[in-house]
Amino acid sequence: NEAYNEKYLGLLVYIGRSKRKAFSYLKDRIWNHMQGWNERTLSRQGKEILVKGVAQAVPTFAMSVFYLTKTFCEELSSMIARYWCSQQDNENKIHWVGWQKLTRSKGRGGLGFRDIHDFNIAMLARQVWRLVQEPKSLCAQLMKAKYYPNSSVLEVEETANMSYAWRSICHGIELVKQGVILRVGKGESIR
């Protein structure tokens, strides 16, 4: 059981069936930060800086490697939204503006908070893009040998033996495909 709690670079080495349990440490870290902030009286601008600079930054490294479920991301967003709207520790206030509107850019009438799920997909798409752009890197060669030896990273199909990290990266493939245009070069990879 101890092996299941091993961490490397702050990330779990083994992700079991329960993703909520595996990533609960992210919620705990954000919650602990926000509890410390509640003791201070902060202006809206102060809260905005703390939310953007700390609460939304804490899960960034994990999100660049693992897919966080939409439900889990909604729980994180809900926790942040409750903090944003509350005045004191146990005091709930009315949300006058929906969280979706707050995640819009400032130019579009929002506050520029991140949509955590969309940001997670974008971070995973970034990993896919690295595999596409740097096929000679050690990581790309390792992934190609294990998961797509006879095709491109953009043509990967899900199989039963995929690790959770690779399955997570596959969530970013569709986003990359939306922005990629096939360019015919020498014609060697065209079927």
Label for each model-derived stretch:
Residues 1-191:
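A helix-boundary/hinge signal
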